[in-house]
Amino acid sequence: NTTGYKMETTHFKSLLYQQLQAKTTSANGETKPVNAQVGLGSRVSAVTSQYVQGSVNKTDSDTDFAIVGNGFFGVVGEDGQTYYTRNGNFGFSIATEGYMLCTSEGLPVLSSDGNELVLGPEYDPTKITVDGDGNLLYPSEENNNNPTAIGLKIGLFQFANPAGLDKTGDSLLMETEASGIALNEDIDEVGKKSTLKQGYLEASNVNVATEMVNLITAQRAYELCSKAITTSDTMMEQANNLKR
């Protein structure tokens, strides 16, 4: 069950058709109603991801975050490029200027201003909480039960066509012309902003029961076609034996 995984739908289209008989008229001038064509199979035309919200499951980690909505986290890849993900399995690592929020692979997570999210050395990462808007909160010395915002916010980004994002592996996605440019929820105008849930992770949106039924259906269809070919071969063999 890959965190933040989105199910994929495969689309097919037909290949060339063999024309056995074109639409024409018979000897007495009557129009024949249909053509006679034989299909030569099909091939994959596209594979699209279904960006439907997955279930949100509680974890025991305060650095796990689930997005409720259409947003994506932004991270900096090893090549310096910006990637996007729905996998909020994060943690704080020691940085030169304090503590950096990063993915489980050590990739820096972007803040709402587009920079790497780094806590100053004066903060204790274990005391950080995050509200639904992504603001990082820290308890004051006077009142530990009333944490206040420290001016840092986890960045959330949206796309006009998320199905156009390019999958690069490790749950990372890259912006393409088909997806459109990334829209920063904190700056750009979006239809509806996302919310964050601290201590939760988004599960895969694949319905196991449905996919198992589809798998069994496909298997039975394959067996049916295989038996039809076997039966046809047997009939042709018997027809050939009639001449002997």
Regions found by a protein language model. Give the residues of each.
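Amphipathic alpha-helical polymerization modules
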Residues: 1-244
